[in-house]
Amino acid sequence: LKGHTVEMMDMFLLSGKRTSHAVAGAYVGIVKHIPFFFGFIYKVGMLISSFRRKSPVYFANALLGKKLASYIDGHDFDIVVTPHLYPAETMTYMKKKKLLHIPAVAVGTDYTCIPFWEETDLDYYVIPHEDLIPEYVKRGVPEEKLLPYGIPVRQDFCRNLSREAARKKLHLPMDVPMFLVMSGSMGFGKLAVFAAELALRCRNGEH
């Protein structure tokens, strides 16, 4: 943000590098290598997730509450923003225990309301689109806290460039169909192989 100072941090580093690597490694490893198990966990999460009670996910992340509170209190922050559920769970615990004294905002980066958002209690929730408001409300997130601003992206993606100018800049043909392959930061895997296979199957001048 122009005129603002932003500090990025991994909350789990407050418990040491081993904890941070273990949490990140377990999550990414399950998604990439045993996705069916991740799907099973997700479905179970949907079944037990409720705004009426707290889940084991909440209590696990609550363990970092005092450390995160100490870190925040030791810096002159005006607001905390998290794009992940786990810190939102931690800060929900902190608010409950009067350990958080500045606003906290969550940014949802999924085009759905994933399990356990409804058991969090932050000041605002930035969500990808206004069409998701009914889903979040149905799950128990107050509508007045929902801000349908979209998923934050680099400003480079917002440049207004015509199709012709973009193709010319990339030295691409002007008059043939083209495919743009995009993926998230984890989970899909072997994107280069997928793109190569897709290229082999292109026909009628497709690229």
Residue ranges and their predicted role:
Residues 43-140, 145-148:
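Active-site and donor-binding regions of nucleotide-sugar-utilizing enzymes
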Residues 2-4, 96-101, 141, 200-206:
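Short helix-capping segments at alpha-helix termini
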Residues 11, 123-185:
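A nucleotide-sugar donor-handling region in carbohydrate enzymes
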Residues 16-18, 89, 114, 153-156, ...:
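Generic structural signal for helix capping and beta-alpha/helix-loop junctions
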Residues 1, 81-89, 184-189:
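Gly/Ser/Thr-rich loops at beta-strand to alpha-helix junctions
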Residues 61-62, 106-107, 159, 163, ...:
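A conditional alpha-helix N-cap/helix-loop micro-motif detector
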Residues 4-75:
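Conserved N-terminal ligand/cofactor-binding loop architecture of enzyme catalytic domains
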Residues 169, 174-207:
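Conserved catalytic-core segment of nucleotide-activated headgroup transferases in glycan assembly
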